[in-house]
A protein has these predicted regions:
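Sec-dependent N-terminal signal peptides
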Residues: 4-13
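Phosphate-group recognition and catalysis centered on beta-loop-alpha active-site segments
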Residues: 16-295
Length: 295
């Protein structure tokens, strides 16, 4: 009888441990079915919870930037928008890489544009401290397919890459429903919209005047989310965006993230109370925790 009781206790403890582990490893996936779903997800709605945007995918110790494994880790903290960087190899392969050179984030060296995809496949990614990981450089196509049932992706395209190439890959992978294109000027905004009027685009505007000028280009508000800079804009900027149903992304990387590290989660909570809808952050864990505690 004692033996039987011990077996039951062991099974119970094992089951509890497994349950705790699965809770700790829970993934906050966002599975959108249509472009209309993405437009609705990005639309400003009063009282809606703020969203974390994981800058460069949310790197942490052991998790290098622009790696699928890092994206998966970020999603254990919150249903993050995954911000990523697209670069291009010497032989025309679209890959994920922020820098123009390989030295900082990989075991390789030299320019990305001078390396072939075959050469890059032999490299490993390094985290921010320079620790070599087992993770490999992913292709843009691989990441678009990965994100289909997992996350909205905000795509930062390096200079020199033809917008048509980016859109063609999005179409090939049927990724319109979970892809946002980042642009840094109005001509590029218009260009992407002309290539595919259904695309959702992250434009930049940090003043009331620049918001008005962007809206005057004719891109529907439902296709837009607006990056307002790495410091807080005037309240009128948030008001104008929200009046047009557009969410505002505030970049907290650098100064605002550093302030939150020193002063605590209330820094993020204050930014959200002031009008920010999305926090583009290098500190996924802290910002996600701050948002989770807000009503």
């Amino acid at each position: 009888m004692k033996t039987y009781a011990w077996i039951l206790l062991t099974i119970f403890i094992f089951g509890c441990n497994q349950n705790t582990q699965s809770q700790n490893n829970k993934k906050h996936y966002v599975d959108l079915k249509t472009v209309a779903d993405l437009q609705d997800y990005l639309a400003y709605k009063k009282g809606q919870k703020a969203i974390v945007s994981a800058h460069r995918g949310g790197p942490m110790p052991g998790y290098p930037e622009n790696a699928i494994e890092t994206f998966e880790n970020a999603l254990t903290y919150a249903p993050c928008i995954i911000e990523l960087d697209v670069n291009k190899t010497a032989d025309g392969k679209l890959i994920l890489m922020h820098d123009d050179t390989l030295d900082r984030t990989t075991t390789g060296s030299g320019k990305v544009s001078e390396a072939t995809w075959e050469q890059l496949q032999k490299l490993h990614l390094k985290d921010a401290e320079g620790t070599v990981t087992s993770f490999k450089i992913p292709t843009f196509e691989e990441v678009l397919n990965w994100g289909k049932t997992r996350a909205v992706m905000c795509i930062d395209i390096k200079k020199g890459i033809d917008p048509q190439e980016i859109v063609d890959m999005i179409h090939k992978t049927q990724a319109q429903k979970h892809s946002i294109i980042i642009v840094y000027n109005r001509p590029m905004l218009v260009k992407y919209h002309k290539i595919d009027p259904s695309l959702c685009i992250s434009a930049s505007a940090s003043t009331v005047e620049s918001v008005k000028e962007t809206l005057a280009l004719g891109v529907p508000s439902k296709n837009l989310i607006m990056f307002v800079g790495i410091s807080e804009p005037q309240p009128e900027v948030y008001e104008l965006l929200h009046q047009n149903g557009i969410k505002a992304i505030l970049g907290t990387m650098h100064n605002l993230d550093n302030s939150a590290l020193k002063k605590g989660e209330q820094v993020y909570q204050k930014l959200i109370s002031n009008g920010a809808d999305v926090l583009a952050t290098d500190n996924v864990k802290l910002s996600a925790s701050a948002i989770s505690k807000m009503k």
